[in-house]
Swiss-Prot record:
UniProt cross-references to HAMAP family, sorted A to Z: PurH
Lineage: Bacteria, Pseudomonadati, Pseudomonadota, Betaproteobacteria, Neisseriales
Full protein name: Bifunctional purine biosynthesis protein PurH
Domain notes per entry: The IMP cyclohydrolase activity resides in the N-terminal region.
InterPro entries: AICAR_Tfase_dup_dom_sf, Cytidine_deaminase-like, MGS-like_dom, MGS-like_dom_sf, PurH-like
Annotated gene: purH
Example GO biological process: 'de novo' IMP biosynthetic process
Length: 526
């Protein structure tokens, strides 16, 4: 391993730059730098040489040309193991550059601004930065490239431990990370430019929709023992910049490694539970809620959710949107086996009780508002892309289409079961009362079959459906679903409407004395 003698540091994100440069200086490394980075280091007392002074060529064209010079790129790309390269570099006075620390213009932050013009976006496309990054990454056997400031402490420690040298393994891993960095950067630029509207040449073009060429980057979190089934291989990746409050931000506090199915089910549970503004519990099995409830505290919410379907809850995923206390965890562990327990926070007592079940996976996930920009679904040879279903309704959005108006309690229950239905696989029917699901019918090819299943679930749980409310994620194609609901004693229904037989459905509600409200919004989930 050869010691690093000269480094070039030019950063947009300067986090930790001063401390890292101080370490390099102590190791006798000569530091080249540009613009704001050079000023930051100089102000901190770190000796730096401006790139313009090093090359003898001034920065020009409003900063567009700073590092695009043979003395820079020759110093990065030259192979120390080839006599011809060494001779040419000596002939032209090109010295080795052994370490490059570069991250790129903040293009994402620029285009996120509401009044970003095309000119603003173009001017924030980095040219010199990616060129140096790729040059250093290509020549990894002789040059180290650092693109992530989070790597500074580990790199500094290795340099100090090895007399200013980095191992081949470290340099190769940094190279791989660098190429991923530039690929993600170029993909982001492509996504932006190919998604602009037809008025792209106007001052402030609008994002028309989906990119003409869709580029996405993810970072591997873990390889898994297997996929959905034992004969399938699998891994879990997270977005480069995960949406606020998304599952990918989880912190595992205890338990076995998460499986493919654990993560899929945990995501379904988390998306559902965080949609409630009051304390809530969601129990999920095979990506479907089998029990949901809201209450004044987590213990009561769990008891109500569990009571919906004690059989299906076995081996399920249990999610809360409030801090979970010891009493709640004790009740859960006394009642059932679970795969995953998740919440924004747990008390010390809760964690102590959970620790007795060492295989249970306990996750803390930040409770923040946010959603993925796109939802993706692979099909054979292609990809379906859509915006997430984040639509929420209030009482003011609903239209009563029956003769009978809902009571105040029914209004509350209708909004509750409607929200739950959004997270149930279609065809979805949800019965509930008093902030508790009484029966959930999911994933059936016929809506009336889902209705019958929801009724049977309530019956099996010993829950009286008289006076309960029902939600359907899509319209009733025939009145038969309403008739089955009426047989259970349910007195209020919420659904989108939109069927060619809507009037027959509305008339059926009136025949049964049911209050019926429509949303005008469908919540299919496949």
């Amino acid at each position: 391993m050869s010691s690093i003698k000269r480094a070039l540091i030019s950063l947009s994100d300067k986090t930790g730059a001063v401390e890292f440069a101080q370490t390099l200086h102590k190791l006798g490394v000569e530091i080249l730098s540009t613009g704001g980075t050079a000023k930051l280091l100089a102000d901190a007392g770190v000796p730096v040489i401006e790139v313009a002074d090093y090359t003898g060529f001034p920065e020009m064209l409003d900063g567009r040309v700073k590092t695009l010079h043979p003395k820079i790129h020759g110093g990065i790309l030259g192979r120390r193991d080839l006599d011809e390269h060494v001779a040419k570099m000596e002939e032209h006075g090109i010295g080795n550059i052994d370490l490059v620390c570069v991250n790129l213009y903040l293009f994402a932050a620029t285009i996120a601004k509401p009044n970003c013009t095309l000119e603003d976006a173009i001017e924030n496309i980095d040219i010199g930065g990616p060129t140096m990054v790729r040059s250093a990454a290509k020549n990894w056997k002789h040059v180290a490239i650092v693109t992530d400031t989070a790597d500074f402490p580990a790199i500094a420690a290795e340099l100090e431990a090895n007399n200013g040298a980095l191992s081949d393994k470290t340099r190769f891993n940094l190279s791989r990370k660098a190429f991923s960095h530039t690929a993600q950067y170029d993909g982001m630029i492509s996504n932006y430019l190919t998604s602009l509207s037809d008025d792209v040449l106007s001052g402030t073009p609008e994002i028309a929709g989906f990119p003409g060429r869709f580029n996405q980057s993810w970072i591997k979190v873990q390889d898994m023992r297997y996929g959905e089934n034992p004969h399938q291989r699998a891994a879990f990746y997270r977005d480069i910049d995960p949406a606020a409050g998304s599952l990918a931000a989880y912190k595992q506090l205890q338990g076995k490694e998460l499986s493919y199915n654990n993560i899929a089910d945990a995501d379904a549970a988390w998306e559902a539970v965080k949609s409630f503004d009051v304390p809530a519990c969601v129990i999920v099995k095979h990506a479907n809620p089998c029990g949901v409830a809201i209450a004044s505290n987590t213990l009561d919410a769990y008891k109500l959710a569990y009571a919906t379907d004690t059989t299906s809850a076995f081996g399920g995923i249990i999610a809360f949107n409030r801090e979970v206390d010891g009493a709640t965890v004790k009740q859960i562990t006394d009642n059932q086996f679970m795969e995953v327990l998740m919440a924004p926070k747990f008390t010390a007592e809760a964690l102590e009780i959970a620790a007795a079940k060492k295989n249970v996976r306990v996750l803390e996930v930040p409770l923040e508002a946010g959603a993925n920009r796109f939802e993706l679904k692979r099909v054979g040879g292609g990809l379906l892309v859509q915006t997430p279903d984040i639509h929420r309704i209030s009482r003011a959005d609903l239209k009563v289409v029956s003769k009978r108006q809902p009571t105040e309690q029914e209004w509350n229950d209708l909004l509750f079961v409607w929200n739950v239905a959004k997270y149930v696989k279609s065809n979805a029917i949800v019965f509930g009362k008093g902030g508790q699901t009484y029966g959930i019918g999911a994933g059936q090819m016929s809506r009336v079959d889902s209705t019958r299943i929801a009724a049977r679930k309530a019956q099996d749980a010993g829950l009286d459906l008289n006076g309960a409310c029902a939600a359907s994620d899509a319209f009733f194609p025939f009145r038969d679903g309403v008739d089955v609901i009426a047989e259970q004693g349910i007195k209020a229904i919420i659904h989108p409407a939109g069927s060619m037989r809507d009037q027959e459905v509305f008339d059926a509600a009136d025949e049964h004395g049911i209050a019926m409200v429509v949303t005008g919004i469908r919540h299919f989930r496949h």
